[in-house]
């Protein structure tokens, strides 16, 4: 098997998130344990991944790999999720980072504007820790790889580690790119030649319709980008960014006539380029990256927080929270960017055509489709929020007046007075937040009204 194929298999393993393996176990020994786990049995949530692994492990190049340096046994947080797999026969060592874990979506958003993020830095710390603990030398071939967020981390490690002479290759599977400031920082630190030398080690392997690798600024050399066929049923949107679908095929059930997904242990063929969804995602990313950094930061933060909420978390792993300004950036700039990328680009029209099973949309959208923005609800909320702020301020004044009217002997009760003053301050902060939100919504309504005027002039 090629290094690329082995990397894809190991990235599939990472999503089982099995923490009961002991360092020193082979892949075959781990799979034997997993065979008794309900999640890996037919109908279990990881049956697809397990099927890929068991079939791939028939090849001793996979089955004999030895796991080591598991981050969960080294004191790292749940977001780091990394380990190494070594081949005793060839001496090759694979350093593998799992994709976006619990609480990591906001960190993805920060990577769109920041030079580095907390989770990227922890990934680097893990790599250098593993090198020093394991006494890894130049005699071993070292491969760094990861999928999605893990692919971004693998690239970051390749570009940032002080042990750059140990990294022979990096396989980025569906991983996003970086901010302008991150790239500028590397160029300044290493010089143009040093920057190019490091990034030439990176190979990008992307699903044909993956929608994550296009985010940010790619540092993968264009001649080292490959797209893999990922047959995904239309209703399974998440499958386009799922590494196991690089091992999938759609087969017709002879009994029902419907197509079902079947997983195997061999990587699918490469295809010439992106599919319709992948091309649209790239166009949308271009619109986002053209925004001023502060607006882009707000849009990215909102999108990533929505992804985090989908997983049941209200804050990021490192305590990241949305601000009113972030939400305002998304509504005023992010939604219009999505509109432009869907309706005003060829990639967006092709994506819609594929979604609705039509062959093509007219290149001239004028007279064929109208985007209607009903901002009356937002406008109504402006006044409602303003009235609510007034009511809160009234309550604040009542609390302060009550505190002032207290008899002297009661005012000497330090705990009571402090409680009343604290409540008044809390109410004041709440009123200020409501007023800020009201003002923000008012500005957004104005922006949409101006956009409607501009659109009406086009028709």
Language-model-detected regions and their locations in the chain:
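N-terminal low-complexity, Ser/Thr- and acidic-residue-enriched intrinsically disordered segments
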Residues: 1-46
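Short amphipathic alpha-helical segments that mediate assembly, nucleic-acid/protein binding
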Residues: 6, 27, 49-50, 58, ...
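A conserved cap/lid and substrate-binding interface adjacent to the catalytic center
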Residues: 35-142, 161, 165-171, 180, ...
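Long, contiguous hydrophobic alpha-helical segments, chiefly transmembrane helices and signal peptides
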Residues: 95-97, 108-109, 144-145, 149-155, ...
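Conserved aromatic-histidine-acidic binding/catalytic patches
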Residues: 111-118, 141, 145, 425, ...
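Serine-dependent carboxylesterase/thioesterase catalytic core
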Residues: 121-124, 128-218
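Charged, amphipathic alpha-helical linkers/stalks
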Residues: 200-206, 212-329
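N-terminal secretion-targeting helices of virulence/extracellular proteins
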Residues: 280-459
């Amino acid at each position: 098997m090629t290094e690329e194929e082995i990397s894809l298999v190991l990235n599939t393993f990472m999503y089982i998130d099995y923490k009961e393996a002991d360092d020193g176990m082979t892949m075959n020994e781990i799979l034997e344990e997993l065979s008794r786990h309900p999640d890996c049995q037919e109908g279990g949530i990881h049956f697809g991944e397990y099927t890929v692994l068991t079939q791939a492990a028939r090849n001793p190049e996979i089955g004999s790999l030895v796991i080591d340096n598991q981050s969960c046994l080294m004191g790292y947080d749940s977001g780091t999720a990394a380990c190494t797999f070594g081949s005793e026969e060839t001496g090759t060592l694979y350093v593998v980072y799992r994709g976006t874990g619990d609480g990591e979506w906001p960190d993805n958003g920060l990577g769109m504007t920041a030079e580095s993020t907390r989770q990227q830095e922890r990934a680097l710390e893990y790599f250098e820790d593993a090198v020093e603990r394991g006494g890894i030398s130049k005699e071993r071939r070292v491969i760094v790889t990861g999928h999605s967020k893990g692919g971004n981390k693998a690239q970051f490690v390749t570009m940032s580690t002080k042990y750059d002479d140990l990294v022979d290759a990096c396989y980025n599977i569906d991983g996003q790119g970086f901010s302008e400031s991150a790239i500028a920082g590397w160029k300044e630190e290493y010089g143009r030649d040093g920057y190019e030398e490091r990034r030439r080690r990176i190979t990008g392997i992307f699903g044909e319709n993956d929608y994550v690798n296009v985010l940010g600024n790619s540092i993968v050399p264009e001649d080292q980008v490959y797209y893999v066929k990922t047959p995904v049923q239309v209703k399974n949107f998440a499958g386009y960014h799922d590494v196991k679908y690089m091992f999938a095929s759609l087969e017709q059930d002879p009994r029902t006539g419907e197509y079902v997904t079947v997983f195997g242990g061999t990587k699918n063929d490469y295809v010439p380029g992106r599919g319709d969804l992948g091309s649209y995602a790239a166009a949308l990313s271009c619109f986002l990256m053209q925004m001023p950094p502060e607006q882009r930061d707000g849009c990215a933060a909102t999108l990533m927080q929505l992804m985090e909420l989908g997983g049941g978390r209200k804050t990021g792993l490192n305590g990241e929270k949305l601000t009113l300004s972030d939400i305002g950036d998304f509504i005023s700039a992010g939604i219009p960017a999505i509109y432009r990328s869907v309706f005003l680009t060829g990639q967006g029209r092709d994506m819609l055509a594929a979604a609705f099973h039509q062959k093509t949309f007219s290149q001239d959208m004028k007279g064929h489709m109208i985007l209607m923005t009903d901002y009356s609800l937002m406008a109504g909320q402006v006044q409602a929020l303003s009235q609510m702020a007034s009511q809160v301020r009234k309550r604040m004044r009542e609390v302060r007046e009550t505190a002032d009217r207290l008899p002297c002997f009661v005012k000497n009760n330090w705990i009571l007075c402090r409680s009343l003053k604290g409540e008044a301050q809390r109410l004041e902060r709440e009123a200020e937040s409501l007023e800020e939100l009201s003002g923000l919504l008012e500005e957004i309504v104005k922006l949409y009204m101006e956009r409607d005027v501009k659109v009406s002039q086009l028709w």
